[in-house]
């Protein structure tokens, strides 16, 4: 299965596996694409620490996290 996997360390770091790229980035908002939809992280001082083909690590003060499925892709 190629499902997204998220690992959080408190609200200070999120490691995202099985992504399809970054759609939007700012220090207050990061949008990451998946096969099934998108993940939206909002917070303060968000920084992409590492980005690899299958994994992204984002640090900062994460205040909210939303996972949205695209219709017809459940």
Each model region followed by its residue ranges:
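N-terminal intrinsically disordered, cationic/polar leader segments
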Residues: 1-74
């Amino acid at each position: 299965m190629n499902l997204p996997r998220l690992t959080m360390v408190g609200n200070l770091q999120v490691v995202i596996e099985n992504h399809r790229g970054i759609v939007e980035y700012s220090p207050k908002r990061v949008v990451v694409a998946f096969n099934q939809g998108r993940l939206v992280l909002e917070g303060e001082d968000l920084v992409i620490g590492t980005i690899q083909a299958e994994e992204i690590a984002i640090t900062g003060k994460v205040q909210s996290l939303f996972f949205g499925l695209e219709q017809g892709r459940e």
